[in-house]
Regions:
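Alpha4 helix (beta4-alpha4-beta5 surface) of REC/receiver domains from two-component response regulators
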Residues: 66, 85-117
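Alpha-helical interaction/dimerization surfaces of two-component signaling modules
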Residues: 24-29, 46, 70, 93
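Phosphate-coordination loops involved in phosphoryl transfer and adenosine-cofactor binding
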Residues: 9
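Acidic di-acidic motifs
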Residues: 14-18
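CheY-like receiver
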Residues: 110, 114, 120-161
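A short, hydrophobic beta-strand element within the central beta-sheet of small alpha/beta folds
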Residues: 56, 60, 68-71, 75-89
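Acidic, metal-coordinating helix/loop segments flanking the phosphotransfer/catalytic sites
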Residues: 19, 36-54, 62
């Protein structure tokens, strides 16, 4: 599958305190109207004022979970993206706070595929958690061992605002 160019008309905010990560996101999401922010305050302003199709939030460095709360208040679907917080605790917190997905930065080279998959699920009114578990479950199980089996996925995959 070659997903590039399938993001036409999508307005996406990407928030990360690492410029090189934002550059990779821009390359991966070619065709989208991409807005980037590298710190909390500018991201907050965009979330509170722009109509967005998706928000991609780093967890560390930019207060990603606080930004997730703001995005959810505006009924904006948000994906948590992280390198340093690839923990079962952060994963569960993302589910509990109603993010639509959680992506390790080690998957950045496949970000376009993953975001396309997320948009497909969103178009059906669903989160990406089930697809994510199918796609990256073995990776998370390798990282977290038995803890992976204890993750509490949403009972209803439909988006609830």
């Amino acid at each position: 599958m070659e997903p590039k160019g399938t993001f036409e008309g999508k307005k996406i905010l990407a928030v990360d305190d690492e410029r090189d990560v934002l550059e990779v996101i821009a390359e991966q999401l070619e065709g989208a109207h991409l807005i980037t922010a590298s710190e909390f305050e500018s991201a907050r302003q965009v979330i509170e004022s722009e109509p967005l199709d998706l928000v991609i939030l780093d967890i560390m460095g930019v207060k990603g979970f606080d930004l997730l709360d703001l995005a959810r208040a505006r009924q904006l679907p948000a994906v948590m993206l992280t390198a340093h917080s690839v923990t079962a605790r952060s994963f569960q917190r993302a589910i509990d706070k109603k993010a639509v997905s959680f992506l390790p930065k080690e998957e950045l080279s496949r970000l376009d595929e993953l975001i396309l998959e997320i948009f497909q699920e969103l178009s059906k009114g669903r989160t990406h958690w089930t697809k994510l578990a199918q796609r990256l479950g073995p990776t998370f199980k390798r990282l977290w061992g038995e803890t992976w089996e204890q993750i509490k996925f949403p009972q209803d995959p439909n988006i609830s605002w």
